[in-house]
Each structure stands twice: as structure tokens, then as C-alpha cells.
């Protein structure tokens, strides 16, 4: 049976989504998802409550509600709904208050809002995103000394999404460089990359998966053929081994998992933004 799931917040609803998805992933559910950010007024909260109640009346099954709301009056309206309501923050606040010995001082938008205390971190993240976009897919090999990581791999193995995730989530300046079909006859590591060997990290992928991804882009082409994909993967993995470049098979991993594994292998600190 499908369950309706609400992620509600007086801010971006990112926290409610992250926690809610993490919990829901433990169960084999089919879900209809509703994300409702910036529920800051009692009027908006009552409208949301009616939406939850209407879905309950239609299905006879309580919607699941993950919420994070600072204002008590607004929070209470959501809690009065017919949904199964779970405050994703308050469950931890009580025990933490006892441990710290101080009372919480909740402020709306503190987690993901822009404040004087996190402005420098925000600027660093924007700088990282700009750098990563300017050094995507081998566009530029200049200023690689400013890169914190340089991802290598064949076309369509996950370099670009991983680079952007590292920049957006952790403020890491990530460049990436592709090895294309024309490189394979005499594959070697460009001199500009050799100078930054400690920053290099390779991504590889199962040939069958690579062929399927490429076929969506250019079907029935040499580029997407299984034979071509196998050859490219073999050549690039050999290059990684010969140059002592650490690498990861991305086939069965999400972008989040790939990024976390890379940072762990390279010993990079995880600074959340």
C-alpha cells in the first residue's frame, strides 16, 4: 500500500527530508512525497493540516509527517493533524539538553540560513562550486594547484556529479579529467596531472553498466558498444595501477556514497555547509 509522506519545516525542509528519507529507507514502502518548506504562519500551518487530513480521509491510512518547526503555535497545529507526526529534531534535543546542562535556543532558519557566523563558509562553498564548474571534464588544466581533489575516469563514469556534490556539500574544490576513446591507443597520464599525483583519484565502472548509460545518450554507436566500454575500462584501470592512483568502482554506489568513500580514502575532513 502506498503511504503519503510529508516533510514540513519553517525553513528549507532539508533537515526533515534528510532524516525522513534515512528512516524510510529502512522499510519496503511505496510512497507519495510532499515537501512543504517555509510553513511559518498559523494560517499556512492550518492549510497544511487540512491537506494531511484530506489525504487521510481519502485513503483511510495516516500520512507520515516528518517536521521541524520552531514556533510552538505553528508546530501544535501540525501535531493536531491526522498524520503520524514525528519531530525530527526534538527527539534529540531533550537528551542533549541534559548532557550539556543548558537550555536550547531554537531559531528558525539557523540550520540552512545565511547568517553572520556562517557567511565565510558560504563564500567558500560558492568559490568551490565556481572552481569545480571551471575545471569540469578537462575544460581547463590551469590552477590545478588550487584543486583539493582531481577525479579521473572514462566518459560517463560519474566524475561530474561527484565533483559537483563534493563542491556543493563540502566546499571542496574538485577538478575532473576524462579519458576519451581517442586517448586509448597510447594512454598516458598528462604531465599537468602528474604534478599533482597525491590529489588524483580514479573512478571506474562495470563495462555493462557503462554501455547502458552511454546507450541512453548515443544508442547503437561505437561509443556505447560493450566492446568499446570494456577496452576503455581495462586501459584506464591499468593506467591507475601503473601510476599508483587510488580508484573506486562506482557501479553500485550513489553519488553520496562515492563522495564519502573518496574523502575517507584521501583522509579529507568533512565540513558540512
Curated annotation (Swiss-Prot):
Superkingdom classification of source: Bacteria
TM helices/strands, residue ranges: none
Binding site for ADP: 153-160
Key words, A-Z: Kinase, Nucleotide-binding, Serine/threonine-protein kinase, Transferase
EC number: 2.7.11.33, 2.7.4.28
Pfam family, one: Kinase-PPPase
One MF annotation (Gene Ontology) recorded for this entry: ADP binding
Top-level enzyme category: transferase
Catalytic reactions on record: [pyruvate, water dikinase] + ADP = [pyruvate, water dikinase]-phosphate + AMP + H(+); [pyruvate, water dikinase]-phosphate + phosphate + H(+) = [pyruvate, water dikinase] + diphosphate
Record-linked NCBIfam families: PRK05339.1
Family, similarity comment: Belongs to the pyruvate, phosphate/water dikinase regulatory protein family. PSRP subfamily.
Function field: Bifunctional serine/threonine kinase and phosphorylase involved in the regulation of the phosphoenolpyruvate synthase (PEPS) by catalyzing its phosphorylation/dephosphorylation.
Protein name per its UniProtKB record: Putative phosphoenolpyruvate synthase regulatory protein
Species this protein is from: Sodalis glossinidius (strain morsitans)
Amino acid at each position: 500500500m502506498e503511504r503519503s509522506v510529508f516533510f514540513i519545516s519553517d525553513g528549507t525542509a532539508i533537515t526533515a527530508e534528510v532524516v525522513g528519507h534515512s528512516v524510510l529507507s529502512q522499510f519496503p514502502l511505496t510512497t507519495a512525497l510532499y515537501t512543504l518548506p517555509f510553513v511559518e504562519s498559523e494560517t499556512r500551518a492550518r492549510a497544511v493540516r487540512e491537506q494531511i487530513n484530506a489525504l487521510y480521509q481519502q485513503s483511510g491510512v495516516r500520512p507520515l509527517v516528518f517536521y521541524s518547526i520552531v514556533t510552538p503555535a505553528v508546530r501544535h497545529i501540525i501535531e493536531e493533524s491526522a498524520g503520524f507526526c514525528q519531530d525530527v529534531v526534538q527527539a534529540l534535543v531533550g537528551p542533549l539538553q541534559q548532557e550539556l546542562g543548558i537550555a536550547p535556543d531554537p531559531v528558525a532558519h539557523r540550520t540552512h540560513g545565511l547568517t553572520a557566523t556562517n557567511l565565510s563558509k558560504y563564500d567558500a562553498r560558492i568559490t568551490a562550486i565556481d572552481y569545480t564548474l571551471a575545471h569540469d571534464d578537462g575544460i581547463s588544466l590551469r590552477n590545478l594547484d588550487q584543486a583539493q581533489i582531481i577525479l579521473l575516469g572514462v566518459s560517463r563514469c560519474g566524475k561530474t556529479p561527484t565533483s559537483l556534490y563534493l563542491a556543493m556539500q563540502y566546499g571542496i574544490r574538485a577538478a575532473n579529467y576524462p579519458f576519451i576513446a581517442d586517448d586509448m591507443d597510447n594512454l598516458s597520464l598528462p604531465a599537468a596531472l602528474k604534478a599533482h599525483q597525491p590529489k588524483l583519484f580514479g573512478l571506474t565502472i562495470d563495462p555493462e553498466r557503462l554501455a547502458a548509460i552511454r546507450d541512453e545518450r548515443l544508442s547503437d554507436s561505437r561509443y556505447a558498444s560493450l566492446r568499446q566500454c570494456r577496452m576503455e575500462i581495462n586501459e584506464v584501470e591499468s593506467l591507475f595501477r601503473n601510476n599508483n592512483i587510488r580508484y573506486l568502482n562506482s557501479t553500485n554506489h550513489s553519488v553520496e556514497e562515492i563522495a564519502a568513500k573518496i574523502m575517507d580514502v584521501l583522509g579529507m575532513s568533512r565540513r558540512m555547509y
